[in-house]
Curated annotation (Swiss-Prot):
Its EC number is 2.3.1.117. Homotrimer. One of its GO terms (biological process) is lysine biosynthetic process via diaminopimelate. It is found in: Cytoplasm. NCBIfam families: dapD, PRK11830.1. This is 2,3,4,5-tetrahydropyridine-2,6-dicarboxylate N-succinyltransferase. The gene is dapD.
Length: 275
């Protein structure tokens, strides 16, 4: 692993010259790193105690892979597609029924999952999209038309509701991935982007939008924070009046309370869907 890290970091310094004809050691390091991410044996980010540590070299390997693979086409019964060759067919293109049983997650038709992403056991993928580098942990549901962006990290037993978006890091290029910790509920059509961290057990209502510059306001105290939602927070969309009271109000996210039993009863996952 350390050898891969060293090779990829060196290659990154000369990324403009990297291509499919580069030294075999570089190509092998990139491809094997993506294979390890695909298997869940390596992650773009992992939690160490209370802090998330980003393996920047893994993210670099993913980005370099776009330079080392040529474009290719894929034809289907009703359309054709044109993309980088290592991503065209997706994670499960050559899987047998036994492979699906071993992986242990549900995946309905029209739920593309890209090679180089990992899905944990008992997860449920409705017609959604999971991009390269993403990690979706055990028991999580990604609902219809939701998207999990490149390198995003989703914890255990989360619910990513219909049409929600968890932002990626490849474009625009971000330093850190967006992270949703264990047991979170992300409401329909919400967007969490730009490396924001949603703390464990938090509940976001429908239509909450949070990036690094979004003000997150404690309703009780008026305190404003950025970029990280504390664990077990209940978040709704809100607005902050202009200072002079004449200009337009600006959007914010509001922490209205800590998660309680009433909230949990409304947002708990359904084990019947994960058998």
């Amino acid at each position: 692993m350390k050898e891969f890290e060293s090779i990829i970091n060196t290659a990154w310094e000369n990324k403009d010259s990297i291509n499919g004809q580069s030294d075999k050691s570089i190509l092998d390091a990139i491809n094997q790193t993506i294979e390890l991410v695909d298997k869940g044996e390596l992650r773009v980010a992992e939690k160490n105690g209370n802090e998330w540590v980003v393996n920047q070299w893994v993210k670099k390997a993913i980005m370099l892979s776009f330079r080392t693979h040529d474009m290719d086409s894929l034809s289907g019964p009703y359309s054709s597609w044109y993309d980088k060759s290592h991503l065209l067919k997706g994670k499960t293109a050559n899987w047998t029924k036994e492979d699906h049983i071993k992986a242990g997650f549900r995946m309905v038709p029209n739920s593309p999952v890209r090679k180089g992403s990992f899905i944990g056991k008992n997860a449920v993928l409705m017609p959604c999209f999971v991009n390269i580098g993403a990690y979706v942990d055990e028991g999580t549901m990604v609902d219809t038309w939701a998207s999990v962006g490149s390198c995003a990290q989703i914890g255990k037993n989360c619910h990513i509701s219909g049409g929600a978006g968890i932002g990626g890091v490849l474009e625009p290029m971000q330093a850190n991935p967006t992270i949703i910790e264990d047991n979170c509920f992300i409401g329909a059509r919400s967007e969490i982007v730009e490396g924001v961290i949603v703390g464990e057990g938090s509940v976001l209502s429908m239509g909450v939008f949070i990036g690094q510059s979004t003000k997150i306001v404690y309703r009780e105290t008026g305190e404003v924070i950025y970029g990280k939602i504390p664990p077990y927070s209940v978040i709704v969309p809100g607005s902050i009046p202009s200072k002079d009271g004449k200009g337009p109000a600006l959007y914010c996210a509001v922490i209205i309370k800590q998660v309680d039993e009433k909230t949990r009863s409304k947002t708990s996952i359904n084990d019947l869907l994960r058998d």
